[in-house]
Structures are given as C-alpha cells and as structure tokens.
UniProtKB/Swiss-Prot annotation:
Belongs to the ribonuclease III family. SMART domains: DSRM, RIBOc. Mg(2+) binds at E50, D123, E126. InterPro entries: dsRBD_dom (IPR014720), RNase_III (IPR011907), RNase_III_dom (IPR000999), RNase_III_sf (IPR036389). One of its GO terms (cellular component) is cytoplasm. Its cofactor is Mg(2+). This is Ribonuclease 3. Residues 164-233 form the DRBM domain. GO terms for biological process: mRNA processing; regulation of gene expression; rRNA processing; tRNA processing. The gene is rnc. The keyword rRNA processing applies. It comes from Pelotomaculum thermopropionicum (strain DSM 13744 / JCM 10971 / SI). Residues 8-137 form the RNase III domain. Keywords: Cytoplasm, Endonuclease, Hydrolase, Magnesium, Metal-binding, mRNA processing, Nuclease, RNA-binding, rRNA processing, rRNA-binding, tRNA processing.
Length: 241
C-alpha cells in the first residue's frame, strides 16, 4: 500500500504540473485540524488558498459556460453554475483526484471520517486551484478546473447530481414575486478544526428554514432544503408588504 509520499507523487503525476513552489501544493492539502494539532510548528493551513481558489473557480466556470452555452440566458447560466460549483460536485472531483488520501489531517478528524467528508474535499479542491493559480497563473488554474468540472455539466442538466437547494429556493421566491432570502449562521460549535454550523434562512426577517452541517455551505443548503419543504412558503412569498 503506498505511503503518504507515494500518494503525493501520484497526485503530482495526475495533475501534470511542474510546480515552481511545491510548498503551495503541500499547503493546499493541509487541513486546519493538522495545524491545530501541530501548532507549535507554525504551519499554515489551506483556508486562505481555499478563499482564492473559490474566486478562480467561479470565474473559470462562468467563462466556460458563457462560451459553451450561447443559447442560455443569464438566469439559466447562473443556476447551472451554482449546481456545477456546489459542494457535492467539488467533492466528487476531489474524490476523482483522490485528494482525501493526500490530506495532512489531524488524528481526531481522520478518525471521524474527515478524509471522505464532502465539505473537506470540496475545500481542498478549491485550495488546490488557489495554489495552482499562485504557482502557474490563471490560465493553468482555470484549465484544471474545467478539465474536471466540464463533464459534470451534462450530469447537472440531466439531473444526475445532487440538487442545489439554495438556488431552487431563491428561484421559487422570485417566481412568486418575492425578494432575496438571507442566510445567517445561528450557531457554531466545536473547536476550529472540528466545527459544526447551524444556519438559518430568512425571508422578510422571518426564519423559514434551519439546517446544520460541518461547513457553512452545507448548513445553508440544509436550511434551504427545509424551507422548500414548507407548504406555506408559497403563500408567504405571494404576500406583499
């Protein structure tokens, strides 16, 4: 069975990138639980790279959809993009790349199944894109994103991927003459490397759904799902102030 270094080598070969600074790749694969358990070493986790990669991802997919789907209007493009860059899609790509096996992760997080947790995998893929952007530039990072995400577009259009409840909820509200919904984090529990979030979705200041998850994105999706299940949501949307 390959050890951690062998797995990292396999990942490098899979990516086909001649890294100028391999430290960026290491940082992209470093989960906050690892730096928490080894904080005396002054290591940096992948959260800042994740922030950067998120922006790269949105631009790359937006550009690709704009060029490849000329028949779609702005609303359809936005909905499709949201489904492509959502957590389940990114986690699926991360599994294809076997990022979970390469992560530097704390022992506690690993014991709790962190290597296959969708939120962690999705964040790692975004961090990887951030690292590639800094090391190789936007064109290379965007190319990597599209290489793995473009095949999922057909799956999204044919309903083979998990639903994006946040987009569905906003569309429902807008179709019925409503306003934007708002998401708030109601509660955070646990240490930084092992948090649980509770999110609420508000419509005109009223809490219409609540959900929990291991990431803010997951919690918000669950809150939107709960809101969509409410039979009285439609009448609330139709009620004008």
């Amino acid at each position: 069975m390959p050890d951690a270094q062998d797995k990292l080598t396999l990942l490098k070969n899979r990516l086909g990138i001649a890294w100028r600074d391999e430290g960026l790749l290491t940082r992209a694969l470093t989960h906050s639980s690892f730096t928490y358990e080894n904080r005396q070493n002054g290591l940096e986790n992948n959260q800042r790279l994740e922030f950067l990669g998120d922006a790269v991802l949105e631009l790359a997919v937006s550009d690709y959809l704009y060029r490849s789907k000329p028949e779609m209007d702005e609303g359809d493009l936005t909905k499709l993009r949201a489904s492509v860059v959502c957590e389940p899609s990114l986690a699926r790509v991360a599994r294809e790349l076997e990022l979970g096996t390469c992560l530097y992760m704390g022992k506690g997080e690993e014991r709790s199944g962190g290597r296959d947790r969708p939120s962690i995998l999705a964040d790692a893929f975004e961090a990887l894109l951030g690292a590639v952007y800094l090391d190789q530039g936007l064109e290379k990072a965007a190319g990597l994103a599209i290489k793995y995400l473009a095949p999922l577009i057909g799956d999204v259009l044919e309903g083979r991927l998990e639903r994006d409840y946040k987009t569905e909820l906003q569309e429902l509200v807008q179709q019925r003459g409503g306003e934007q919904v708002q998401y708030v984090i109601l509660k955070e529990e646990g240490p930084d490397h092992h948090k649980s979030f509770t999110a609420g979705v508000l419509y005109r200041g009223v809490l219409v759904g609540q959900g929990t998850g291991r990431s803010k994105k997951e919690a918000e999706q669950q809150a939107a799902k709960k809101a969509l299940m409410k039979s009285d949501l439609g009448s609330a949307c139709n009620h004008k102030k």
